[in-house]
C-alpha cells in the first residue's frame, strides 16, 4: 500500500501557501497556482511544512489522501522550479518554429499545424527539430506535450514522427518481398 499521503511537503524559501476552505493558493517566484481539493481532507501548515490528513481510513479517503498530497507537492515544485518536457522530431522536412506564442509544425501534411500556447505554458525551439514545453503546472505541461506529440505520433516502420526525448519507439519489420 502506498504511503505517499503521509509524507510531509517542505515549502521552499520564496513560496507561500494559503488555504481558504477547500481552495489552496500557492505563490512562488515562477507564478501562482490555485486548486480546489476535497473539503474532508485537512491541510496543516506549520512553518515551512505542509501535512495532509484524512478524517478516517475508508478506501475513498485513502485514495484522496495520496492524490491530494501529490497534487499539492507538484504545485509547490511548479511555482518554485517549474516543469519541462522535451520533444524531438524525426523525419525528412519535419520542423518546428515559433510565431509569437504559437508553435508552427511542419510534419509532412499538406498544411502546417499551429499549436497555441495555453496559459502559463511557454515553448522553446532551440533547433528546428527540438521542442521544449515549459510551465508551472505539471498537468498542463504534460497535456500540451502530449497534444504536440499527437500531431504526428511516431510510426513503427521508420520511426518518423514527434516523440519525447528518450522515448523508445517499438519498431516493426516491413513486408518481405517475393
Curated annotation (Swiss-Prot):
Keyword field:
Ribonucleoprotein, Ribosomal protein, RNA-binding, rRNA-binding
Q: Where is the signal peptide?
A: none
Record bears the keyword RNA-binding: yes
- What GO molecular function annotations does the UniProt record carry, in alphabetical order? rRNA binding; structural constituent of ribosome
Could you name the Gene Ontology cellular component terms for this entry?
cytosolic large ribosomal subunit
Q: Set out the biological process GO terms recorded for this chain's protein.
A: cytoplasmic translation
Which Pfam families does the record match to this protein?
Answer: Ribosomal_L6
Disulphide bridges in this chain? Answer: none
Q: How does it assemble?
A: Part of the 50S ribosomal subunit.
Similarity section: Belongs to the universal ribosomal protein uL6 family.
This chain's function reads: This protein binds to the 23S rRNA, and is important in its secondary structure. It is located near the subunit interface in the base of the L7/L12 stalk, and near the tRNA binding site of the peptidyltransferase center.
Q: What is this protein called?
A: Large ribosomal subunit protein uL6
Species of the source: Lactococcus lactis subsp. lactis (strain IL1403) (Streptococcus lactis)
Amino acid at each position: 500500500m502506498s504511503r505517499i499521503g503521509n509524507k510531509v511537503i517542505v515549502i521552499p524559501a520564496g513560496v507561500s501557501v494559503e488555504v481558504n476552505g477547500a481552495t489552496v493558493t500557492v505563490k512562488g517566484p515562477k507564478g501562482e497556482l490555485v486548486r480546489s481539493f476535497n473539503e474532508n481532507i485537512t491541510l496543516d501548515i506549520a512553518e515551512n511544512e505542509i501535512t495532509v490528513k484524512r478524517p478516517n481510513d475508508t478506501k475513498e479517503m485513502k485514495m484522496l489522501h495520496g492524490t491530494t498530497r501529490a497534487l499539492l507537492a507538484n504545485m509547490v515544485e511548479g511555482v518554485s522550479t517549474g516543469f519541462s518536457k522535451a520533444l524531438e522530431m524525426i523525419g525528412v522536412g519535419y520542423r518546428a518554429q515559433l510565431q509569437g506564442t504559437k508553435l508552427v509544425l511542419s510534419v509532412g501534411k499538406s498544411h502546417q499545424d499551429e499549436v497555441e500556447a495555453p496559459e502559463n505554458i511557454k515553448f522553446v525551439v532551440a533547433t528546428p527539430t527540438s521542442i521544449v514545453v515549459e510551465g508551472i503546472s505539471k498537468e498542463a505541461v504534460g497535456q500540451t506535450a502530449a497534444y504536440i506529440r499527437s500531431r504526428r505520433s511516431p510510426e513503427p516502420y521508420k520511426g518518423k514522427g514527434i516523440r519525447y526525448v528518450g522515448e523508445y519507439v517499438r519498431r516493426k519489420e516491413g513486408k518481405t518481398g517475393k
